[in-house]
């Protein structure tokens, strides 16, 4: 982690002046100092102080939305804090020069260097490394959600099992508006998978069973979620190639956390996780290597601080709108426990 080290040197000298008042005396000395008629030097040295602090990309005024710029496999080793929940959308390793259809146009599916795959062994090692670091950042009763496709989800599942997690569910997100398959040689890709796992085999996790029934017309919530892909209004502040919709993240957060919870996203991108968290009265830390996407994240949070935008978002996200109508008190902020805040 990058740090800012502030060096404060205190120099002190007493000047004697003839003046009509104390205020006038101070003005005279200030003027002489501004003109460099008075220059303090080493003989005036009194003390020196060093103060070290983490270099943050952004921290909102309400302290509920924090961004770190850098590699999560490095940054997660640099601070001590336990989160209630983690959501991760790691690289899928599918940027191989292929093409797809987006808004009626043929587009390249290359996301960037961060999404280019290596050997199966290197992908497995990468997943074990970051998942192990995340495990150390979870409370004992905490849970982790990891999104993926067939390109990486099996590697992720193996890593979770090897590291001692208990897999609770594998959610199938069935997109109601997927892009078409233009090769016409196999079925259209219309799903993504989200593994939900708890840190410990023995320590119980939190699941908001009744709330999930409430948003599912009084029936048990199943592990197949019919939800749309990203909507244009969610990209007003900029585009991220793998941005998740608020409908998906809101359901995840509602299902597995309480108001006031701390949520981590180690591959935050444009921070849909953080926006959903703040819409629901939770707090958020996001980490990403790409400054371009952190700029989008910051813009989205600043946009959300507008009261009208905040209200508009709540009406557009299906589960939130339903709960707002039926149980508005659910979204009241709880008091944070004393000292329960990030260490930076």
Residue ranges with predicted function:
Residues 53-296, 339-344:
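Core catalytic lobe of class I
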Residues 57-76, 304-333:
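S-adenosyl-L-methionine
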Residues 10-12, 62:
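Glycine-centered tight beta-turn/hairpin loop motif at sheet-sheet or coil-to-beta transitions
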Residues 1-10:
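Short aromatic-glycine-(Arg/Gly/Cys) micro-motifs in beta-strand/loop hairpins
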Residues 288-306, 310:
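A contiguous, mid-protein "functional segment" used to position or interact
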Residues 35-56:
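Short, mixed-charge low-complexity intrinsically disordered segments
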Residues 21-38:
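A short, charged, amphipathic alpha-helix used as a generic interaction element across diverse proteins
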Residues 12-20:
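A short, exposed loop/beta-hairpin motif centered on an aromatic-Gly-Thr core
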């Amino acid at each position: 982690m990058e740090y800012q080290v502030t060096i404060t040197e205190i120099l002190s000298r007493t000047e004697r002046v003839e003046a009509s008042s104390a205020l006038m005396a101070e003005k005279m000395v200030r003027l002489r100092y501004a003109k460099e008629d008075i220059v303090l030097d080493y003989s005036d040295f009194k003390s020196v102080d060093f103060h070290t602090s983490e270099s943050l990309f952004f921290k909102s005024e309400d302290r509920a939305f924090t961004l770190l710029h850098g590699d999560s496999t490095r940054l997660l080793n640099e601070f001590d804090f336990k989160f209630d929940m983690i959501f991760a959308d790691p690289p899928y390793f599918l940027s191989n020069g292929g093409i797809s259809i987006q808004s009626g146009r043929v587009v390249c599916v290359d996301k960037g260097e961060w999404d280019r795959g290596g050997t199966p062994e290197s992908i497995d090692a990468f997943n074990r490394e970051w998942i192990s670091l995340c495990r150390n950042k979870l409370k004992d009763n905490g849970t982790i959600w990891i999104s993926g496709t067939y390109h990486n989800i099996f590697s992720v599942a193996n890593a979770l099992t090897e590291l001692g997690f208990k897999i609770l569910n594998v959610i199938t997100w069935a997109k109601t508006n997927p892009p078409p398959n233009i090769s016409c040689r196999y079925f259209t890709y219309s799903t993504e998978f989200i593994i939900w796992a708890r840190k410990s085999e023995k320590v119980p996790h939190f699941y908001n069973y009744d709330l999930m029934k409430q948003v599912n017309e009084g029936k048990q919530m199943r592990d197949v979620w019919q939800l749309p892909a990203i909507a244009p209004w969610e990209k007003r502040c900029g585009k991220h190639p793998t941005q998740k919709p608020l409908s998906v993240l809101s359901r995840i957060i509602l299902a597995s956390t309480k108001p006031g919870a701390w949520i981590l996203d180690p591959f935050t991108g444009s921070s849909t996780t953080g926006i959903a968290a703040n819409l629901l009265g939770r707090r958020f830390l996001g980490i990403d290597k790409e400054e371009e996407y952190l700029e989008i994240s910051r813009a989205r949070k600043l946009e959300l601080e507008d009261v009208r935008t905040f209200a508009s978002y709540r009406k557009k996200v299906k589960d939130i709108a339903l709960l707002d109508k039926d149980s508005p008190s659910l979204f009241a902020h709880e008091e944070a426990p004393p000292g329960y805040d990030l260490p930076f």
